[in-house]
Amino acid sequence: MENNTVKFLPDKAKRIVLFCDLRNSTDILMDFEQDIYSGIESPGVKAFTYAEFIMDVHETSYKELYLGHENTYAEIYGDGVMGIFPEDNAKYILENIYRLTKRMRTYNDSPSMGVFKPRIDIGFGITAGEVSFIYYPLDKRHHPVGRCVHEAARIEGISRLYDARVLISDRFFKFAEGYIYTDQRFSYRFIDRIILKGFREPITLFELLIDNDPRFEIKKNSMKEYSEAYSMYCRREWGTAAELFQKIYQEYGLGIGSVMAKRCDVLSKSPSNPDWNGIWNMKDK
């Protein structure tokens, strides 16, 4: 899929890059193959298929994220969608994500979900950086090129690890923080400082919190304890940090607490590093 009206620029220009991806897509596909969601067929009416399901997910994502806009580049990757936006579109992107996540919650709250159709969960990764568009004669299409394209994909790929739905880089946060602070529908929480797999420079990650998430208040209420635990983690107080992270997991039910507690255990058994600065080097995508 290519938006033929977008202004493809061969020179680098600052853009916002968004990846959103359907989680558990392989499990959903296998469930369809086992006719778990086939429902009841009636004369002239076929059962709901995986092809129809994934098309509906893509079409809804495309429409709610408004990827057909003339200044937006959009492309479908398997069960996910990438959108590339002008750098001044931060507020516009927040509104679009809000609509899509609200639509997703309405869909999942339907009594028929899990019976005739699968529940869905979509993860997001967003960053900002320089992008150029290169024309490929092989498929006669323009394709985006830029480090931030890979960065957004990596961020989305680890969003589930942190129990985060919308994971964003500090680069995108700088564009969006003014809107986040002034709109009560949104908030954010600090997540981590890491080096993404295949990258060389550290990045700071935040989760964009949205009030249509059932755990919106839970995540906001956990931020003070998480900040305390993370400070101890940075000071190499592994035992105390692990206990606090584990408490976050147990009391708030947030997976990030368990992830960070296990990381502290690994670090406590590793040789002491005098240059430790709290930055974790990711080994997985």
Q: Where are each of the predicted segments found?
A:
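Catalytic NTP-binding/metal-coordinating core of nucleotidyl cyclase/transferase enzymes
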Residues: 4-95
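A residue-level structural signature of the nucleotidyltransferase/glycosyltransferase Rossmann-like core
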Residues: 17, 123-124, 165
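Amphipathic alpha-helical transducer elements in NTP-driven molecular machines
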Residues: 51, 94, 146-152
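Catalytic core of nucleotidyl cyclases, primarily class III adenylyl/guanylyl cyclases
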Residues: 63-92, 108-147, 171, 199, ...
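Conserved, well-folded catalytic cores of nucleic-acid-processing
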Residues: 100-103, 107-110, 151-162, 179-182
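Cytosolic regulatory/linker segments at or just downstream of nucleotide-handling modules
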Residues: 160-238, 246-247, 252-263, 267-273
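Intrinsically disordered, low-complexity, charge-biased linker/tail regions
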Residues: 273-285
